[in-house]
Amino acid sequence: MLFLTQVREVVVSEVNIPLSFSDAAATRVQTLIAEEENPDLKLRVYITGGGCSGFQYGFTFDEKVNDGDTTIVNSGVTLVVDPMSLQYLMGGMVDYTEGLEGARFFVNNPNATTTCGCGASFSV
């Protein structure tokens, strides 16, 4: 039995990428992957229902890329997004920050009409 999978890979240097992956986020992911000693890990960003504003962002590490996923590569690090989540993230940027409130990955999302105070949830 033969299975075909369709995976769309986008390189950050391309002009019309659907979602950006910042250098700060890529650098932090590189560090975390090195700590885990698993070079197959990729950062997956996804959207779920919930949070203060209706939808919320989620981040996890994943070893596999599923059929239909979009992958975005920056500095040898891969960001993975499923097709349903990508529609809410188009034109956005996955970034990483460290500050007084702690360290976190976040999404700068131009599609969000409202966001909660912590930035973890949004509505469209």
UniProtKB/Swiss-Prot annotation:
Gene3D superfamilies, alphabetically?
HesB-like domain
Record's protein name: Iron-sulfur cluster insertion protein ErpA
* Species annotation: Vibrio atlanticus (strain LGP32) (Vibrio splendidus (strain Mel32))
Alphabetically sorted, this entry's keywords are: Iron, Iron-sulfur, Metal-binding
The record's comment on protein family reads: Belongs to the HesB/IscA family.
PROSITE patterns assigned: HESB
Its taxonomic path starts at: Bacteria, Pseudomonadati, Pseudomonadota, Gammaproteobacteria, Vibrionales
Q: Which InterPro entries match?
A: FeS_biogenesis (IPR000361), FeS_cluster_insertion (IPR016092), FeS_cluster_insertion_CS (IPR017870), FeS_cluster_insertion_RrpA (IPR023063), HesB-like_dom_sf (IPR035903)
Q: Which gene encodes it?
A: erpA
User: GO terms for CC?
Assistant: cytosol
